[in-house]
Each structure stands twice: as C-alpha cells, then as structure tokens.
C-alpha cells in the first residue's frame, strides 16, 4: 500500500514535472496538492482554495495579500507560532492589536507583543490594564494606576507571585491595600511600603504568619531592633525547630552577637547562622541529633567533615543510612509558563538539517538516490516531509530527488516478533489508511456529532443489539461494569464526542506518539498515576459531561511544531482513533491495577476489543488474542513497559473500524 493515494501521487508527479511551480499544474491537481499538504509557499491565485482546505495555510502566502481575519483564525487554531505564522502576524501587528481583547490575548500568549506595545494598548484605552494583567502580569514592567477595587479584583484571579509583581508596578500602592490583601487573601505584604507600619504587634503577626516569605526584610527598622520584637521572633524560631526559616535566622544573626548565638544554639548555629562550631559527635543530645539529621543538607554545604562523621556515627549506632539531601528551603514564586510559545524545540537531527547535509554533499560529490533514501528513512511515512522539503532552502534538484522518494513510499507489511509473537507491522498501514481517507472519516464524524446516541437512528446505531446507554446502572468493580462503560464511551466517540483526558493525561496513545514525534519518556505506570481519581470513575449519563466534540478537540494545540501536522482534519482523525486506543488500554490497566484483578486476563482483553468493535457497529469481526498477552500486561503494570502486542491488537481494531466507516472493508 502506497503512503499516498494514486491521485495524490499523480498530482505530485505533475508538480515535480513543472519544477515545483504549483501555478503550472491544473486546478484539479492543485486542490489535491492542497488537501495533502504537498506544497511549499503558495501564490496569491490559490488563496481562497488554500484557506478553505486548511486555515493554517495562511502562513504560506505573501503577508501583504493576507486577510487579517484569517490570521486570527490561524492563531486560534495553533499552540505554537512557527516562523511563517509569526512573520505574517508581525506584518499585520497593528491591525491585529485593534481587533479585540481576545486577539490581544492570543498575541500576548504567543509573545508577539513588546512591552511598548502593551503600554500603547493601555494608554490608548484599547484594552484595560486589568485585562492584560490577568493574562500575564509579568509582561507589564512599567508603572500603572489602578483603583482599589481593580486591585482587589485582580488579586482574586492571579497567582501570588503575580500579585507581588503587581505591587512593584503600581503607582498608588499603599499600606492599607497590602494589609487588606494579606488579611483577606493570605498574600505576604513583601513591599517597601510595609516599613511604614510601626505597630510592633502587627509586625510580629505578619512575620510569624509568613515565616518563609522574608516579610522580616520589610519591617520598620525601629521595630526590628526592639528587644521585645527580637525576643518574640527568637522564641518563634525556637518553637519550630528543627524546621528552619532561613530569613528569620539571618535576621537573628544580624541583631544578636555571634558569641551569644553559639552559646545558645551550639552545633545548631552551624546550620542556622553559618557560624563555626566544633564538637564531638558522641556528646550530641538526642534533640541535637534530630536537628542535624533533618538539616543535614546545611551541614553538607557548611561543615562537610562533620556531616560525613555524623553519617558514619548513625550507620554504626543505628544501622541506617542518612541519604544526601539538598534543596532550597525558601519558597520561590515561579512565573506561570504560557501554554503557547513562539519557541520551537529543534531536534538535533531535524529533517531540515538532514536535507541541508544532503544538499551540501551533492555539491561536492555524486549522491545516489539510494543514499538519500537511506538517510531520510527515519522520516519515512511522515506526511509533512513533502511540505517541509519544499519550504527548505536547499537546491531545487535536491528537493525533487527527495520528493520522488517520498512519492513512492509504501507502508511496511513485513512481519516482526513481539515477545515471541509473530505480528504484522500494522501501525504504518493504519497511518497510511488515515492519510488516504481522513477527509471521509472527518466528514462522517462531524455528520453525527450532534446526535443523541440513545435515540440515534444512523445506520450504525440501527444495526446494534443495544442502543441505549449500557452503563447507567453498572458496578465498575466488575468486568461487566467496565465493559458497559467502555461501550458507551466508544459509542459517544463514534458520534464525534471524545474524552481526551480520561486518565488525567492527554494524547499518550501510540498514534500521536509515533506520528507527531511526541516522545513520551514517562513509563505507562507513571502516566496512569491519577487513574484512581480520573474520569475513569464516570459512567452513565455523567459520561457526556466529560466529553468534547471532535471539532473542538485539540489538534495543532497538542504538538510542539505545527509544521509536523498535516492539517486540522487529519490531526483530529488521528486523535479520534488514538483516543479509542487509549480507552482500550486504560480499561485494561484499571482492571489490573485498581481492581487488582488478574483472572482470565486474555479473555477480558478479547472482550474489551470486541466491545469496542461492537459499539462502532462492527458485529462480525474477530480478533484472536495470544496467551502471551498475560505476561506482557504483567510487565506493563510492574515495570511500566509499553505493551507492544496490546498496541498491535488495538491498532488492528481501529483498522477494522476505519475500513468499516470508509466503506472499504
């Protein structure tokens, strides 16, 4: 089976024969090339056709001809802005900035606006300062004025760290405001304005309320040197030992002489105040031993010889080992990271790097097509290779050589062994099928997504023996309960509604991992960490509340680089099938780990696979499950290893479903 259908390969051949000039091929072939992403930069004459095919094609046109509303739609459908979309967005930046607050929000999230842009937006009253601050307070580094009500409203909606940043950019901040915010929202008043507070009792209350936040550094100097204040803080520190508050210790060190601190705290003074103190470990009291062990990281850094001797002492005396400990004891406020970015993480051996290497090699020596095919083999069956090749800076002759190779790629049909089981390599075949038929599949899914499955009269539902929700009354502690819930989930999916977050993780299945180079380093047992408190507990009528239409599902928003995604429809069809596989894996994993049920595993796996097919209206197909599935699933649970054979079985299931939906079965 070829990667591309015959008509797409023919259109690509025509494009190659025209030296990659898409304007010189027929309109029929142009539409095919657009549908399959077989193009590079596009001419003005194809604007409407390209935008109708996929809104993100807007980035491949000269910026001066692009409609601003199309850029907005493209930004809304992206999670990362690549160099092409960034270029057209910056070209039309002024128009985008006055296109409404939602567009401004997108531009901020994509880092398309400078500090001066934000200042202009506020000064010209295009958007309110509070709106921008709620998006990302750290973007604003110039002074602003807000009313008390606006400040309080902001504090309710932004993180603590952002509030502290807000204090630094307000012209009209006063003591009453930060004290009120501390009382009502428990945000530390760490601002110079706090030094105006002279009430010693209130100062003590604030310091002891926020011992980790260094409020002590902003206390009025007269209060800091008050004997009563010093004694109260020292008593507080002593009361909480062996827990240490570095900021308070630094304060005590600044107001009490070293000799007095050493006399009172002895070996503790090394960790608390970074003072020098020598002692024999045999003389340590039990309280001192506990303190040293809890704070061993301080001794590792400040008195390593003592720390090593203490470890040896505990090993000999108590036959246990004190591990290395490290870490900053002071809480630091971390700035929230945007879910969107203009930064693309580049692989060390990206396609562009390899193409450049081939191009340079051709200039210096003869390079055979076999050599090129071998070098780019790791990108075999990647549907975006053609587009990325045409967008690259390499010589046109090198581009044509690569395109000829990609045009004739076939899906692999050789057999391979997975833990002694001979299976066919089905994933490439399935991905090729999806590439061939993704528009038909997407058309079907969107045609049924608004139908209520309990009363749906589509051809698939009419063929079912049971058309209502099975899991309305079910016991998820039993196999029947799990299968009933899986049946309902799958029926919803077939009607265009999916749960991308079933186990608390998105898109961890094999299709998105392989197709979009989403290398999940986490083991499966780590991915399933929250399965006990996830949507796996939802059943019956409550299932629908956890679902989203396939048309609203994350597609480009899932991936690091939009250049790695062919188009929106293709990505969503991949997500649809990937989600069904996730349902299968999660159901089996839940039975094994949460219910601790390992009886008749092979039989249960078979039931899961056939339940999914039945829910999709495929009633007369059979998937044979090998006995060795039980050993593989034990390894999956115990070691988190990828269940290759189970993936193979699941991919066989979605291949059958795909063929059935497409009418090619």
Swiss-Prot record:
Keyword Protease appears in the UniProt entry: no
A Pfam family assignment: Pox_E2-like
Keywords of this entry: Early protein, Membrane, Transmembrane, Transmembrane helix
Induction info: Expressed in the early phase of the viral replicative cycle.
Bilayer-spanning residue ranges: 573-595
Signal sequence interval, chain numbering: none
Subcellular localization, as worded in the UniProt entry: Membrane
Coiled coil start-end: none
Membrane topology: Single-pass membrane protein
Primary subcellular site in the record, as a coarse category: membrane
InterPro entries: Poxvirus_E2/O1, Poxvirus_O1
GO cellular component, one term: membrane
Family: Belongs to the orthopoxvirus OPG074 family.
Protein name: Protein OPG074
